[in-house]
Amino acid sequence: MKKTILILTALFALTAFAQPPQLSIENFAPIESQGAFPAPLKRAANTPKSSKEYSPFLVSMLKQGRIIYGTEMNEYLDNIVEKLLVNHPQLQQEIHVYILQTPIVNAFSLPDGTVLVTMGMLAQVTNEAELAFVLAHEIAHYSERHGKDDDSKAKKGDVVSRYMRNQKYSREQEFTADRVGLLTFYKDTPYSYDILDGIFDVLLYSDLPFDEIPFQRSEVETDFYHFPDNYFLKTVANIPDRSNMIDTLLTHPNIEKRRTLAKGLVRNLPNDGRKEFVQPQEQFTRLRNVARFACIDRFLINHDYDLAIYNTYVMEQTFPNNAYLRRAKATAYYGAAKHKASGQTTTFMEPYRDVEGEQQQLNYFLTKMNRNEYAVLALRRVWTALQADPKDEYLQNVAKDLINDIFVKNKMKFIDFCDYSQGTTMEEIAQAGGDTTRPAAANSKYDRIKQQNMSAKVLPDPKFKAVNYMLVDIHSDSLFKAWVNDAVVNAEMQAVLSYVQDKKIGNETSMLIATPIYLTYNKNGQIKSLADDKRNAEQLQKLMCRALKRHKITPITFDMDFSKPETDTYNNFVKMRQWNADFTNAGGLDMRYHTSEYLDDIAAELGSRKLCFVHVTDSPDRAYFPSKIFLPWLIPMFPYSLPVVVGVMSLRTHEVDVDFRIIDVVDGTTEASGHYSRQEVMRKAYVNGYVYQRLEQYVRK
């Protein structure tokens, strides 16, 4: 008896150990893969491109670090698949389900049996049975051999969006997948048929936020300041009924036809005893919330700050004191302020006229604010988050960066921010016993510094607007005053400090070299050759390593060896890729990157906190040919110049853009940066020369 108990105890312990850790929103962090690296993914990553088994989309997603495996979410999906394939042992061996890290609502079936369910789908479905239908549909695509995996038409933009555009199934294939999925796989499960309306609604409105909640003015205003009424819409655009929309305008076409046919297929099938949930409903709700947090994190990486702000606002209605949401909101407002300051308004949000529903109020408000209002509102958000988490180094660095933007770059002064609520009169201040004496004008930087340390409160001014009242509750904070003083004083010494910092940095003995992103496009905006781009990136990385070695600095390259993959290495690789995406989406902005802290562990492990990253785009310039310059000189020498004329006319310049950046991955600061953009014929040589020169300049300092 005792032996039996010991065996059962041991088996229970082994089972518990084998289970992935439970995902939680209380201490949410970017989701990492768990367990052993899956053999199907290893096989896919190492399949030769010449093979019929090669899966370009899967390999692309894997090498971008977008695949998640081995987590509690994956196990939840596997349990559903097990029920769908209970009578199909062969398919049980062939189907492998993974999660694709993107907020886009979709799922994909690939020819090798891989099924990818997006994080966006997990965030939007309303019950487990809806997920079962989605998986049954994708498995049917595979069993009916509908799958195709072709990235030859890849264009600029998010690779998942491109794949969705290029890989749409025909109407007949979609209908077949619904029929086979329902009658061959879904029918064998205990899941309810009543969910069909729900899942087709999820697909029909897949571009909408997690929920529709009015965006209240109190979200961006307080009792002591108010924006003008014209910063807000009186009514927002209603979300129209999409059931009669033209299919080509929808992300998921044929929805209404599919809905009608699917409901017809199961109309006469018994539904008694079938359920929306087979696994615990509480687990589904928790995992869906985790998926929503993960989508918000991806919005931040993509710099889709309007989506990040609104969806964070939605989630805060349920989790009002969540540390991650508080930080995410601060990050989103900060990122929006940095883009606004650089004039890149359209890069971080959709035009409000293109937005439907309650989110339109937010986008309209973001459209109305000026750069000072953006910066100060962002500072308010960051300061609030910092009060709750005072040891958060990222928030500290972001707050200091915003203070520098406000008081140095935007040239606002400490006395530009009132200590009294908007609308307070001098009479009210006097009646309350306050001092209504105005300080003398500050004519020098020393006067400004002294005024910032004065105990006298800043009084209302007829010229003040809402922005001048936005720091009432922060203005007298001793830490805030100290950071403002530091920003003002340091601005006067910036050149000296920069030199000192460069000297210190120049003494680094090692540097991380991220694999460059090198993208070459043809005249139609399509990627010419991923293989050529990879080769160019590898050659550029080798050149960067040589430049560092010349100065006895050890280059540390970090890439993923998929021939011997390990999960810990893959998770670090994912973090690096997320940072790459964050950097690229910033468009060259000097800002504290949301993903910088992801690299802290990598920096500690590899022994360097400096990271050099290069992003290159190479596109044909349709408007410029070198022949325009040379032909007038060559025509008089015709016909002797004919070979030269033909050669010159065959040359076509390319528009080359190079972003060069050296980042301190611990505090997120940019140590060196450069941007190169011009029309070139011999562009590869110029790119290599520019990057080599920038590294030389950096290390010689």
What are these regions (language model features)?
Residues 1-26:
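Bacterial Sec-dependent N-terminal signal peptides
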Residues 19-499:
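A Zn2+-metalloprotease active-site environment signal
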Residues 33-40, 69-70, 499-549:
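Start-of-domain marker
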Residues 100-102, 119-120, 199, 514-517, ...:
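Active-site-proximal beta-strand/loop segments in catalytic clefts of secreted hydrolases
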Residues 145-150, 333-340, 558-564, 618-631:
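Short, solvent-exposed beta-strand-terminating loops
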Residues 157-169, 527-531, 633-635, 641-643, ...:
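Short helix/strand-bridging catalytic loops that position acidic/His residues to coordinate divalent metals
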Residues 174, 478, 483-523, 601, ...:
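C-terminal/domain-edge helix-coil "capping" segments
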Residues 524-617, 665-669, 673-675:
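N-terminal segment of the mature soluble domain
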